[in-house]
Regions:
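Small-residue-rich helix-interface/hinge motifs
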Residues: 2-80, 291-310
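Residue-level signature of transmembrane alpha-helical entry/exit and packing/kink sites
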Residues: 3-7, 91-100, 273-277
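Alpha-helical transmembrane segments of multi-pass membrane proteins
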Residues: 11-15, 66, 107, 111, ...
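Membrane interface segments of multi-pass transport proteins and intramembrane proteases
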Residues: 45-48, 131-134, 219, 305-321
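PDZ peptide-recognition modules
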Residues: 71-94, 102, 106-257, 261
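Transmembrane alpha-helix interface/packing and boundary motifs in multi-pass membrane proteins
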Residues: 243-247, 281-296
């Protein structure tokens, strides 16, 4: 149940943000909006408000803002006094580009803001210093009296500068003695402790039993740092996608069922974990929608860029046919990955 609720929260925020971006930019450029729908499939509820039909559909796996002139294969009723200049296809290339890119842009902005909120409200592990944030009970560190807030200055005389130095030092294969001489900075004084850290092959070697501290940032700093984190994560997402497409790594793509399970797991771990997950999903959604694939926003943008470069517009019927093919492929992929999710969850 928690997975279903979590999934509905995640997909609602992502889809409404994405389609809201299209809607607002279309309104700004005076494009006729026939429908704003959340979900796919048969309509469960709808209400006409002005020129736009607002609807809720059966399957919460997406949404649509239906614009006049976006797909020439469909004929929608026009309001009384309709002006053909309100068709998306009649707008200038930069206006069409703006409307198409605005959905993914809103997802990327939301990912940036959610990451900034995480950095400001919860913080991230401080890996730049050997500062102890938590000591696990029943571990060598706990038995030796190491406390949260201690800074591990050295181990066996080796000075430590960052968190990873702790693991590297105690995992040194050249060290055979289980007794480690650790120097701590506690407040304004230095403390020396001898810690018995026996080898533990089950956990990959010696385990001290400490976790790093967390560092939070003022909101202005969090907003700036979030840009860097989001950029780095986006690059890794695109690298991973490229490696999957070139078969350098095995595909581990998940569909709606897999996302629901992951959303539920994130919420069980706490609100900050859920916010982090929501940010990552928005980043994925924004980037994937900008890929130059037919039917995706990025695929439609490619046609506009080609028009801007050549001065010639691709015939609408041909563009519509290409996007229709893209839709069929995407639907097939959704069915495929959903089937894989179900097999992975219930039959393995």
């Amino acid at each position: 149940m928690i997975s279903l609720v979590s999934f509905l929260i995640v997909i609602s925020i992502c889809v409404i943000s994405h389609e809201g971006g299209h809607y607002l930019s279309a309104r700004w450029r005076n494009v006729l909006i026939h429908e704003f729908s959340f979900g796919m499939g048969p309509s469960l509820w709808s209400r006409q408000k002005g020129e736009t039909l607002w609807s809720l559909r059966a399957f919460p796996i997406g949404g649509v803002v239906k614009l006049e002139g976006e797909d020439s294969s469909e004929e929608d009723p026009k309001p009384e006094g309709y002006d053909p200049a309100r068709s998306l296809s009649s707008k200038k290339p930069w206006e069409r580009l703006l409307v198409l890119a605005s959905g993914a842009t809103v997802n990327l902005i939301l990912a940036w803001l959610l990451t900034a909120a995480l950095l400001a409200g919860h913080g991230i592990m401080d890996l730049d210093r050997p500062l102890v944030g938590k000591v696990m009970e029943g571990t060598p560190a706990f038995s030796a009296g190491i406390q949260p807030g201690d800074v591990i200055k050295s181990i066996n005389g080796k000075e430590l500068n960052k968190w990873s130095d702790i693991r590297e030092t105690i995992q040194d294969k050249d060290v055979t003695d289980d007794i480690f001489q650790i120097t701590l900075q506690r407040g304004g004084r230095m403390i020396g402790v001898d810690v018995d850290i026996p080898a533990d092959p089950a956990h990959g070697g010696r385990l001290l039993g400490v976790q790093p501290g967390r560092i939070t940032y003022p909101i202005h700093t969090a907003l700036r740092k979030s840009l860097g984190y989001s950029w780095d994560m986006g690059v890794e997402i695109l690298k991973g996608l490229w490696m999957v497409l070139t078969r350098k790594v095995q595909s581990d793509v998940v569909g709606p069922v897999g996302i629901a399970v992951m959303a539920g797991d994130a919420l069980k771990q706490g609100i900050w974990s859920f916010i982090a997950f929501l940010g990552v999903i928005n980043l994925h959604l924004g980037l994937l929608n900008l890929l130059p694939f037919p039917a995706l926003d990025g695929g439609r943008i490619i046609f506009i860029l080609a028009e801007m470069a050549t001065g010639k517009k691709v015939p609408e019927k041909w563009e519509a046919l290409i996007h229709y093919g893209g839709v069929m492929i995407l639907i097939s992929l959704i069915i495929l990955v959903t089937g894989k999710d179900i097999i992975r969850l219930f039959f393995r």
